[in-house]
Amino acid sequence: MVNHVDRNTTLCVSLAARPSNHGVRFHNWLYAELGLNFFYKAIAPTNIEQAVAGIRGLDIRGAGVSMPYKAAVIPLIDHVDPSAARIQAVNTIVNDGGVLTGYNTDYSAISELLASHSVDTDLRVAVRGSGGMAKAVVAAITDYGMGGTVVARNAETGVELAEQYGWAYSPEFPTDAQMLVNVTPLGMAGTDEKVQSFSDEEIGRADV
């Protein structure tokens, strides 16, 4: 963790309606491991326009962005990277000398992961979940040339996500899935592991 903060410390923040300590602990631990004089602070903004203006005004180096602000920050920043433009959702803002650029690192990470492992585009995919990260994952998989099924208990968001990218929707796990991606809040407090995880049988039938 951070041992001290001084006038040379570079500040990064997260903007979230309900900030948690998970990201704070991880970022500050990683800064310490890398020997960086950075400090990460979670913030629940009362006014998102003023919060984004504060990134510029206070020379904050970057910001993580969570719901419900991922779309709201887009008109407030200077540039939107293709990763964020694709799904109209920003999860990271980088401040370069007062110029704010928005990225979606979920989309970028999945895209790079698929390409670096040369994943077979013929594999049928099952994505469990239909929230904000699921949208980034489904978009990245679609752009890679793959398709499949959105598996979600919430029929409204599940159907909407599936239709947007030309996927199937099912509340139940499809038997033909060869690649599994779990983007539920599995592992977080209050989640149901039995409902949100893939079964041993489902994992056993899959290739990836």
Question: Can you say where each PLM-predicted feature lies in the sequence?
Answer:
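NAD(P)-binding Rossmann-fold cofactor-contacting core
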Residues: 143-165
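Phosphate/diphosphate ligand-binding glycine-rich loop within oxidoreductases
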Residues: 2-117
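Rossmann-like adenosine-cofactor binding region
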Residues: 163-207
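Receiver (REC) domain switch-region micro-motif
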Residues: 63, 125, 180-181
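Glycine-rich adenosine-cofactor-binding loop
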Residues: 102-107, 114-143, 152
